[in-house]
C-alpha cells in the first residue's frame, strides 16, 4: 500500500475540498488519462486496486503513471466507544482529489487497450471519471 515514509504530525484535520484542481489537470506523461469529475478522498487501497486492474489489462505493455499519492491520514474510533476521549487512531491514508485532476496516465499502448484498462480502473473508484487524451496543439504535444 502507498503511504508516506514519515510525517511531521500523524493526525490531521479533515479540511474541505472546494474548487477545481489547480495542477495536474492535463495529461503530461502518457497519451491517455483518467480524470476525476467529483471531489473525493481516494484511499490507498482504491489506488492499489486501480493499479492492479490497469497492469493486468495491459499485460506488460506500455507504462502507467500514478499521479496521486495518499498523504493525508484519517482516523477512526473503535466500535462501541463513547464520545470524547480524544481523536481516534490512524485508520489509513487517503489522497485528496478535486474535480479535474488526472489520477492515472497510460502511454505506449494502442487506444483500444488503454481505454479498456482505464474503464476497468474507473469501476474501482467511488467517483465519476472520464477518459481524456493528450491535447495536440499546432502539431506539438502539450
Swiss-Prot record:
RNA-binding is among the record's keywords: yes
NCBIfam families: rplP_bact
UniProt-listed PROSITE patterns: RIBOSOMAL_L16_1
Entry-linked HAMAP family: Ribosomal_uL16
GO MF term set: rRNA binding; structural constituent of ribosome; tRNA binding
Name of the protein: Large ribosomal subunit protein uL16
SUPFAM superfamilies named among the record's database cross-references: Ribosomal protein L16p/L10e (SSF54686)
Biological process according to GO: translation
GO CC, alphabetical: cytosolic large ribosomal subunit
Biological role stated in the UniProt entry: Binds 23S rRNA and is also seen to make contacts with the A and possibly P site tRNAs.
Keyword terms of this UniProt record: Ribonucleoprotein, Ribosomal protein, RNA-binding, rRNA-binding, tRNA-binding
Family per similarity comment: Belongs to the universal ribosomal protein uL16 family.
Native organism: Fervidobacterium nodosum (strain ATCC 35602 / DSM 5306 / Rt17-B1)
Name of the gene this protein is made from: rplP
Amino acid at each position: 500500500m502507498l503511504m508516506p515514509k514519515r510525517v511531521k504530525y500523524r493526525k490531521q484535520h479533515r479540511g474541505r475540498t472546494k474548487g477545481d484542481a489547480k495542477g495536474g489537470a492535463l495529461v503530461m506523461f502518457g497519451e491517455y488519462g483518467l480524470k476525476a469529475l467529483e471531489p473525493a478522498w481516494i484511499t490507498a487501497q482504491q489506488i492499489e486496486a486501480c493499479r492492479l486492474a490497469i497492469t493486468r489489462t495491459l499485460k506488460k505493455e506500455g507504462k502507467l503513471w500514478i499521479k496521486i499519492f495518499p498523504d493525508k491520514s484519517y482516523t477512526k474510533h473503535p466500535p462501541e466507544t463513547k464520545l470524547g476521549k480524544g481523536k481516534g487512531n490512524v485508520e489509513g491514508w487517503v489522497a485528496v482529489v478535486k474535480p479535474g485532476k488526472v489520477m492515472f496516465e497510460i502511454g505506449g499502448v494502442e487506444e483500444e487497450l488503454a481505454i479498456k484498462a482505464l474503464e476497468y480502473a474507473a469501476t474501482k473508484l467511488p467517483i465519476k471519471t472520464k477518459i481524456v487524451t493528450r491535447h495536440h496543439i499546432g502539431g506539438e504535444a502539450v
